Amino acid sequence: MKKLLLGLSLLLAIAIFAVSCSKDDNGNDVVLPGKANSFLTASFKGSKNVKLSKVNDNLTKKEFEVILDNGIKIEFDKDGNWVEIEAVKDVGTIPSEFVPKDILDYVTEHYLGLGINSIEIEDDGYEIELTDGTDLDFDLDGVFIKVDK
């Protein structure tokens, strides 16, 4: 009788576990903050979300990730502010409108012929990745700090 009761308990536990894990988090129920939606609508007219997911990365403050059909990936914080914009899928470069003018001028002057593959805003400034893989750090005012290897 003990074995039967133990067996039924184990079977019930497995059934409950299977039901609770059956719904994968595929992003369909993820809702972006209004500010993020407004940003996407204004900045990427005509592009569609290919993938939307919730990231919850406390270290980098990234909460949401959107990949657009044009190959641009945008990561947002919990309030809907973009924290990283990156060109994926061999797109090459991100639109320059997201890069502060001083940073864009520096890259144009010192890295002729290279584009910006990604920009990430951090608490103390910006990190830029060029199309050749070089990482550059700038302060919040767009002043060059260093090449980050």
Predicted regions: what is each one?
Residues F17-S20:
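C-terminal motif of bacterial Sec signal peptides marking the signal peptidase cleavage site
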Residues N28-K149:
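First exposed extracellular module after export/assembly in secreted or surface-exposed proteins
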Residues M1-L4:
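Positively charged n-region of N-terminal signal peptides that target proteins for export
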Residues L6-I14:
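Sec-dependent N-terminal signal peptides
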Residues S22-D25:
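Bacterial signal peptide processing site
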